Amino acid sequence: MANRTVKEAKNVHGTNPQYLIEKIIRSRIYDSKYWKEQCFALTAELLVDKAMELRFVGGVYGGNIKPTQFLCLTLKMLQIQPEKDIVVEFIKNEEFKYVRALGAFYLRLTGAALDCYKYLEPLYIDNRKLRRQNRAGQFEIVYMDEYIDELLRNDRVCDIILPRIQKRSILEENNEIEPKVSVLDEDLDDELPSDEEKADETNRPKENSTAVRRPRRVRSKSRSRSRERERRSGQGNSARSRDYYDELEDYDRQRNRVRNRDTHNEDYDRRQNNGRHDRERERQDRDSIRERERDGDRDRRDRERERERDRGRHDQRERDSRGERDRRRY
């Protein structure tokens, strides 16, 4: 009874919401200790408190397929089917990043393509780190924007097969969604000169050609800005899309540089820790070898003493038996 979907729940993608998770994983969740103890009789209000306690994301791990707490709460949300406003508040929550990750994962499972692009794409500006548990049970670092990109592009996330959604380009061609605008557009608008500044430059009296001559680099920069203005004003959605992808490449390169620096620092710390662990392990090995040698010497001494006692008892019995024979003879 506790594992049934609520009566007022609606079908999602033509099926029971809980069936969006494969049966084998669903059965493992029902049998898990966290589901039985922490997810029993949860409501939408109480589920918020449980989501705030999350410390990592992930699917299943281990040889016997153990579900993570993140996956248990996802199934609970599919079971009680909270209102869309609650899910949107999960996604807009900036204080608890794992609450946002849980809401984004649930919306990707149950939401339409338009809702997924509408509510998940703004999260590309979130560069916070998330801990994710892999199938081996080990933790790895993933960034929030990378996690959101996986939800929108990959077929499987956190060991769950995601429903298919329409590509963004198709929705743009059908005018169902506005072309994506990069967050860098505002910076580009600030760098471009306004019409008034352009008019002032035009009306300014000409001076000596050698004095007003600017470097070639500056002219090319102004010329590129002019071409950019003309392209932005004269072209349609396709041009804006191309601009966005160019800016996205620049953003990815900058993000990769930051990540490479973080990875280098983490590798350095890991090498330092490994060196300390190796020295500690060598010291423990030396101590264990000395302990085994002391134990071996102690055992040898005990065996020698035992043999001496046995030899003494044997000699005593021989003397006693010889004396007894002598008494019988006389």
Swiss-Prot record:
Classification of source organism: Eukaryota, Metazoa, Ecdysozoa, Arthropoda, Hexapoda
Keyword set includes Membrane: no
Gene Ontology process terms (BP): mRNA splicing, via spliceosome; regulation of G2/M transition of mitotic cell cycle
Subcellular localization, as worded in the UniProt entry: Nucleus
Region described as Disordered: spans on this chain: 182-330
Compositionally biased residues, Basic and acidic residues: 240-330
Descriptive protein name: Pre-mRNA-splicing factor 38
GO cellular component, as recorded: catalytic step 2 spliceosome; precatalytic spliceosome; protein-containing complex
TM region(s), chain numbering: none
Regions of compositional bias (Basic residues) in chain numbering: 213-224
Keyword Nucleus attached: yes
Pfam family membership, one: PRP38
Function per UniProt: Required for pre-mRNA splicing.
Similarity comment: family membership: Belongs to the PRP38 family.
Acidic residues compositional bias, start-end: 184-199
Keywords: mRNA processing, mRNA splicing, Nucleus, Spliceosome
Oligomer and partners: Component of the spliceosome C complex. Interacts with Mfap1 (via C-terminus).
Tissue expression from the record: Detected in all germal and follicle cells.
